[in-house]
UniProtKB/Swiss-Prot annotation:
PROSITE patterns: SECA, SECA_MOTOR_DEAD. ATP binds at residues 85, 103-107, 492. Its main location: membrane. It is a peripheral membrane protein. Part of the Sec protein translocase complex. Interacts with the SecYEG preprotein conducting channel. Has a central role in coupling the hydrolysis of ATP to the transfer of proteins into and across the cell membrane, serving as an ATP-driven molecular motor driving the stepwise translocation of polypeptide chains across the membrane. It comes from Clostridium tetani (strain Massachusetts / E88). Belongs to the SecA family. SMART domains: SecA_DEAD, SecA_PP_bind. It catalyses: ATP + H2O + cellular proteinSide 1 = ADP + phosphate + cellular proteinSide 2. This is Protein translocase subunit SecA. GO terms for cellular component: cell envelope Sec protein transport complex; cytosol; plasma membrane. The gene is secA.
């Protein structure tokens, strides 16, 4: 502990001193609240809403509101938030992260700030990591809010559109991070505002906040459509990758999770794909397929990174061990893995809309979170999200004994020792939870235990349907549970009396994770609410963490000691070496996430501009003036780009200008070079704008004014969506190659910002051009089938009534004040228009 922390206390301790007086005030109201009838307690909600409408703030009513919610919780679910939970609730209301250990009742804590903030009527989202927890929390805690007169909804994966709208319109809405994010993206793809489901993003309480905002931070949410590229090349690239020899043709950088061809490998690629120079930019597509095939075959591990079930490649979450349904690796990696595994290769998709969790959750007016482990990532929460972490004291002291790590030379020796430890613990009846890092490792231990005759249950991605049930049994007398990482997080492991006598739940970690936080989560499964327990991690020098990031000094000591497979060492120096390796990885991952957000901020600002303008269009703003402005901008831009100051080329330039404008809005041969050759650039612009305005006025006469406004809106939205999708792809391609700018002594992030901005300006211009083009071409179309039916009907009936109802297709009309198309230079009404 630093010297000033010894004198002044930690940051959390100092913050708690400010909160405790508020908790004391809530405590003092306890007796008053108990005396209220149910009706009087319920009426408090309307009283608070009225006070807020008269100018009081949420902080003004916090003490009373918390006291009301506390009493309601006791009456409805027979749970009364204790002081530590009140502290947690206040920290959440303040828009911070409350670190609360496992079993401290985070679900109940969330009800306090949720009730208070819902009183404003702007909505509160309580975010969990899966549908099961969202549904469970809504069912258990929803009754408290409903008792107090508030509405509660839950967003689940299979909800219909109107059910989603209903759930979001509730005062408090439970849902998963992915569903909330996807609904936001879908809302920004609709054509009618009535199709939107979400309201403004007001206040969010994120459960397991570290899992969502840090572990998932690099995972973009993507809504995609079917791509057009063939998948055959993935199979060709896979065949090539499988023919290569490690170290000779390619090298694997495990720290960077990268696989690279050697010079010899490049020669083989040139021979295999019949290329002159593999590095040529024209061979970029081949390079991309080869890189992904190499990564799929030599970096991605089956039953660790992914699993194959029913002929489908499924991603396994490295942090939770859960299958991530509906997710696919991007950039063709998923297709490369499908080719590797010999299953059906699906087409690469086209991204229609995308956002990262980092940027989605930063859009909330107020954001807060709860987790059992946040302190190790305190700097990241503060720097990226502006959230500080406050550690909430436990209700009862933690009695769990955390033993120091045991280090073995080989994996074989480590696993033998783990199994021996499980057997001995099982004999005493003490339950054991064994944490593994992959499906493969969990099945290895399971097999070893079977040979020893030890009954056990396995929880990994293959058995995820039974997750809650398996976890609920993990604390039973004599139970042995093998689980990948943090599967079962969010479900408490409760202990019976005889288990407490046997020493509580024992945690065995089979290797250290890259992040200390994940290790702490595993430990935190034991010792909840003052229960006894123990934890220990078993490590070998062959573990990925030690092999890739461990210090040579530690390896040297183990070699000098001449340890056998079944011999272990325990020392402070060993524990420090392991922690330093973890800090190294955490720092590396933090830097990656920081860089990612610098890149993502560029497209995020662009996304905000597009979605804001899109929203204004949806809200039914009259677009006529905006469309006229677009027409003027397009004409000005086209004239400026076509007409130079070179006299000799003027006529040729005018000819090209007219042809270009004929592709956008001018009817063919409507205007000739001689009509413009004696005018200045500004006069040309004005003349063309007047012509466009007249043509557009005639176009409006084909439709009713209201119908035309609707057409403008739909066309503009469709053009914006199409151009935005293409822009996302282009920005992605730019990002993939931007790292090479470092070789030119350019900052890749600055280069990405500059070029991304140019591409965005170009997209905005193209939106204007296409919108104008489509609006000038829009016609009342008649379908051929209908036309035939109409003819037959009119012949049979002999009347003209049906003819009036037929769709009418009109040709572009010449306005009376337009230039006559004969080329005379006179107005139409004074020339050929007279004859008409």
């Amino acid at each position: 502990m630093r010297i000033w922390e010894k004198i002044f206390g930690t940051y959390s301790q100092r913050e708690l001193k400010r909160v405790i007086p508020i908790v004391d005030k809530i405590d003092k109201l306890d007796q008053t609240m108990q005396k209220l009838t149910d009706e009087e307690l319920k009426n408090k909600t309307n009283e608070f809403k009225e006070r807020l409408s008269k100018g009081e703030t949420l902080d003004d009513i916090l003490v009373e509101a918390f006291a009301v919610a506390r009493e309601a919780a006791w009456r409805v679910v027979k749970l009364k938030p204790y002081r530590e939970q009140l502290i947690g609730g206040i920290i959440l209301h303040q828009g911070r992260i409350a670190e609360m250990k496992t079993g401290e009742g985070k679900t109940l804590v969330a009800t306090l700030p949720a009730y208070l903030n819902a009183l404003k009527g702007e909505g509160v989202h309580i975010v969990t990591v899966n549908d099961y927890l969202a549904k469970r929390d809504k069912e258990t805690m929803g009754a408290i809010y409903e008792f107090l007169g508030l509405t509660v909804g839950v967003i689940l994966h299979d909800l219909e559109h109107n059910e989603r709208q209903e759930a979001y319109n509730c005062d408090i809405t439970y849902g998963t991070n992915s569903e909330l994010g996807f609904d936001y993206l879908r809302d920004n793809m609709v054509v009618y505002k009535e199709e939107r489901v979400q309201r403004k993003l007001n206040f969010s309480i994120v459960d397991e906040v570290d899992s969502i905002l840090i572990d998932e931070a690099r995972t973009p949410l993507i809504i995609s459509g079917q791509g057009e590229k063939s998948t055959e090349f993935y199979k060709v690239a896979d065949y090539f990758a499988k023919s290569l020899i490690k170290e000779e043709d390619f090298t694997v950088d495990e720290k960077a999770s990268a696989v690279m061809l050697t010079d010899k490998g490049i020669e083989k690629a040139e021979a295999y794909f019949k290329l002159e120079n593999y590095a040529d930019p024209e061979n970029m597509e081949i390079q991309h397929h080869v890189v992904q095939a190499l990564k799929a075959n030599y970096s991605m591990k089956k039953d660790t990174d992914y699993m194959v079930r029913d002929g489908e490649v499924l991603i396994v979450d490295e942090f939770t061990g859960r299958v991530m349904d509906g997710r696919r690796y991007s950039d063709g990696l998923h297709q490369a893995i499908e080719a590797k595994e010999g299953v059906n290769v699906e087409r690469e998709s086209k991204t229609l809309a995308t956002i990262t969790y980092q940027n989605f959750f930063r859009m909330y007016d107020k954001l807060s979170g709860m987790t059992g482990t946040a302190q190790t990532e305190e700097v990241e929460f503060r720097e990226i999200y502006g959230l500080d972490v406050v550690v909430i004291p436990t209700h009862k002291p933690v009695l769990r004994i955390d033993n120091s790590d045991v280090v073995y030379k080989s994996e074989k020796g480590k696993y033998m020792a783990i199994v021996d430890e499980i057997v001995e613990t099982h004999k005493k009846g003490q339950p054991v939870l064994v944490g593994t890092v992959s499906i493969e490792k969990s099945e290895l231990i399971s097999e070893m235990l079977k040979r020893k005759g030890v009954p056990h249950q396995v929880l990994n991605a293959k058995y995820h349907e039974k997750e809650a049930e398996i976890v609920s049994h993990a604390g039973e007398y004599g139970m042995v549970t093998i689980a990948t990482n943090m599967a079962g997080r969010g479900t408490d492991i409760k202990l019976e009396e005889e288990v407490i006598k046997a020493g509580g739940l024992k945690i065995i970690g089979t290797e250290r994770h890259e992040s200390r936080r994940i290790d702490n989560q595993l430990r935190g499964r034991s010792g909840r609410q003052g229960d006894p327990g123990a934890s220990r991690f078993y490590v070998s020098l062959e573990d990925d963490l030690m092999r890739i990031f461990g210090s040579d000094k530690l390896k040297g000591i183990v070699e000098k000691l001449g340890l056998g497979d079944d011999e272990a060492i325990e020392s402070k120096m060993v524990s420090n070496a392991i922690e330093n390796a973890q800090k190294k990885v955490e720092g590396n991952n933090f830097d990656i996430r920081k860089t990612l957000i610098q890149y993502d901020d560029v497209i995020n600002k662009q996304r905000e501009i597009i979605y804001k303008q899109r929203s204004e269009v949806l809200e039914g703003a009259d677009l006529k003036d905006q469309i006229q402005e677009m027409i003027r901008d397009v004409i000005n831009s086209v004239v400026d780009s076509h007409i130079s100051d070179i006299e000799e080329e003027f006529k040729e330039e005018l000819d090209k200008l007219i042809k270009f404008l004929e592709d956008i809005f001018l009817p063919k041969d409507y205007i000739k070079v001689e009509h413009l050759e004696n005018l200045s650039n500004d006069e040309i612009k004005e003349k063309l704008y007047d012509i466009a305005k007249n043509i557009y006025t005639d176009k409006e006469e084909e439709f009713e004014s209201e119908q035309m406004r609707d057409i403008e809106r739909v066309i503009l939205l469709r053009v914006v969506d199409t151009k935005w999708m293409d822009h996302i792809d282009n920005m992605d391609h730019l990002k993939q190659g931007i790292g090479l700018r470092a070789y030119k002594q350019q900052d890749p992030v600055q280069a990405y910002q500059f070029e991304g901005s140019q591409m965005f300006d170009e997209m905005i211009y193209n939106i204007k051009v296409d919108t104008v083009r489509y609006l000038f071409r829009v016609q009342i179309e008649k379908a051929p089938e209908r036309e035939q039916v109409a003819k037959e009907t009119s012949t049979n009936q002999g009347g003209d009534d049906t003819l009036k109802k037929q769709p009418i297709k009109k040709e572009p009309k010449i306005g009376r004040n337009d230039l006559c198309p004969c080329g005379s230079g006179k107005k139409y009404k004074n020339c050929c228009g007279r004859e008409v």
